Amino acid sequence: SKDTTWKLIEQLSESHRCVAGLKLAHNVGHQQALWAGLDFVAAGDYDAAVSIDADLQDDVNAIVEMVDYYNQGADVVFGVRRERKTDTFFKKYTAQMFYKLMRTMGGEIVYNHADFRLMSKRSLKALVSFPERNLFLRGMVCMLGYPTASVYYDRKERFAGESKYPC
């Protein structure tokens, strides 16, 4: 990120034990960067981790409900968009086709879930033990077989900047 995000992460991690940051040497792509963070957490002294995009579209208030489900025994709690109001028509259509294709091919994937989720230490360790090099985390997390729950939320408009994803 070219803004002050890293400086904020450093400041927060100094004052809050539950905040940690991982600064990569260069851009490795979304899934690989997320994997690096999850691997970092799996090796650390943490009970669970929440992954959330930094674009401020996912509702941080949903994390409270995620933690509640975790405390009730869920190892993975998916943040699921109620609707795709912030997406273009093309993005909505291609997303719908993607989920249909995944179901047709037998892939287990949570509909309208991106990478906003809570994962327990146990599920993180299982995930990072996969030998995958070409990552599709939304699909891999669903394959773990641990107890799951879903928290539904309304996605917000992007706070600043533009998505680097096509369409």
Residue map of PLM features:
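Conserved S-adenosyl-L-methionine
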Residues: 152
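Alpha-helical transmission elements in cytosolic ATPase-linked domains
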Residues: 4, 8-11, 36, 65
